[in-house]
Amino acid sequence: LSQQWAEKCARQLEALGSRVLQGPSGPKDNPYPVFLASVSQPIDLAIVFGGDGTALTAARHLAPEGIPILAVNVGGHLGFLTETSEEMEDTEAVWQRLLNDRFAVQRRMMLQAQIFQGNRTNREPMSEYFLALNEVAVKPASPDRMITSILEMEIDGEVVDQYQGDGLLISTPTGSTGYTVAAGGPIIHPGMDAIVITPICPLSLSSRPIVLPPGSVVSVWPLADPDLSTKLWTDGVLGTAIWPGQRVDVRISDYMTKFIILRENYSYYGTLRNKLHWAGARLSFTNNNRN
């Protein structure tokens, strides 16, 4: 279905004189490096058909280039980050709106993570940076048994806590409605810049989520069995291994994801109600004071 939508839109845009690059995106397909390397002029817009996972993949690759994304929910489940397919029913009208600048651009903060060896005197990273729009997850990795992770967390160089459990989530406000809310973290409005730390199934009841200002640097040290690695995940995609003696530093990225919003009546709170199926109280009361 996504391919059918893409082919239809590509034909229409080419008829309007646009140059269109088209390719599949999924767990085994990553067209973005080829797209970015094959163009001689800046890309004006990326149109992505799929679910939130498809939009997240596009964001990680396109945010460094400043390319805005029009994400359309085709076959997805939640659709927190996407426009509804109903908004694209009259595609010709959509192209005219884009040409006439009749849309909004929503900017979402991102996180970046890097691996370092040893203490803070070593400022040279061992890895490239890994971008995340939703969250960075630090979790134990073992192919044959479920192990408890022991993670020490620093904030701005100060040790805050040691967590024993299934791992640690470091998320953006955008990601607060994903893995983070499932792990008991707070929902943060995406108009804010903040970093949310949420333990995953901690063994201590006193280990609670923390909301940090955007300038904070979160460092996580694995303290488990030296023969076992810990894994770094970004938006559910495996990034790299973290071994004892190494740390991962997570901070706000200089890049931001730009989403095209077509809905003129867009409401974040309406999205929360619909996607999270908030039903309110069992008894419904009438507010006669509202005009």
PLM regions: where:
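Proline-centered loop/turn at the N-terminus of a beta-strand
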Residues: 66-70
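A residue-level signal for conserved active-site and pocket-lining positions in enzyme catalytic cores
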Residues: 47, 73, 136, 236
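Glycine-rich beta-strand-to-loop/alpha-helix junction loops that act as flexible
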Residues: 49-52, 173-174
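ATP/NTP phosphate-donor binding region
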Residues: 1-49, 61, 85-104, 115-130
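Short glycine/serine/threonine-rich phosphate/pyrophosphate-binding segments
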Residues: 3, 53-59, 177-182
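ATP/nucleoside-binding phosphotransfer catalytic cores, i.e., glycine-rich phosphate-binding loops
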Residues: 118, 125, 138, 155-159, ...
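Catalytic core of DAGKc-family lipid kinases
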Residues: 75-166
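Gly/Ser/Thr-rich active-site loops/lids in small-molecule metabolic enzymes
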Residues: 159-206
